[in-house]
């Protein structure tokens, strides 16, 4: 692909959808994410139903996070040197098998053969397997997108990609909870497997693209090249660091149940609206960005978005009104979605085709760890300094990180997207 190709004139917001492969790619991502998010909710429900132990829920996340983060760099190396369509077929088939095993162990017939005490360890093992697949999934999909669309459409492809992910992340848990409540665990797993199968079918509509990276040195040196590239690129390292620290300090969403029950007194119904507010803000903003792109001066807009994200967190922490809190959570999701689009576009634009898997793997290690640790940080600070001060502290630190980044990268705020591509800063 020509690395000098960049935006010369505006394309319509639907331009990227004219590419059949991208439509198949988008369908694959949506249906897989839908099934994945359904399954995440259902596994949590089922494990807690069997154990009545909150620690067991924490172990579910740990069983997935450890292999996903641990294998990320190797997954990026494999993604770079492999044909992406074939790799994704193997990854999705592995997830399909893990889900099938969980379906089998939850059927009433199997309860006569498998003691209840064995079911939870089997679930943990299957979640561990899905975590391994996740370590290959992110770098493979990131690398593939660059092979199916021209470079000038990267900003729009990132917007559509993130929008479909957000939409699936909202609808998946909602559908999972409803189906589980009305029809039970087994039927829910049948639905999950159906959606995974649909995503598998979408892969068959993708063309086979030869890898752009042929390793000529040891695997250790190849992996090191990906890490070194990120740390030498000022803008890419800054974008990843901003994401890491904003998620780490801005993980106040983990404290929503405390606000719903103890501060706003709105109960579980209000909690549902609070969780939906941020996601709704993100989805609507992403849809707007398919028409009005934030990529005029991306680095400046990224810093503004992160600052707005931190400010909305502070205000949400101080709010005593339920409806004002919903507005602030909506704004938090909106600002976050802007930063997501800009970061993903910068990554697509600055990463050489033969290093996309490894660079995506480094990004996954940054982000994959920050979500879990951010939730832990919010819980720990809430215990040490109480809930409201903890949220205000997190938002303040997010703004501080954005301010420090601005001082260190002031020269980047004036660059347009085309200038960033030309300078590859």
Model features per residue range: what roles?
Residues 7-67, 228, 232-278:
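Helix-loop boundary and gating motifs at the non-cytosolic
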Residues 30, 114-136, 244, 312, ...:
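Hydrophobic core of transmembrane alpha-helices in multi-pass small-molecule transporters
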Residues 43, 136-149, 338-351:
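Intracellular juxtamembrane helix-capping segments at the cytosolic ends
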Residues 54-55, 151-161, 268, 353-363:
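Loop-to-transmembrane helix entry/capping segments in MFS-fold secondary transporters
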Residues 117-119, 166-202:
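Helix-loop-helix hairpin linking two adjacent transmembrane segments in secondary transporters
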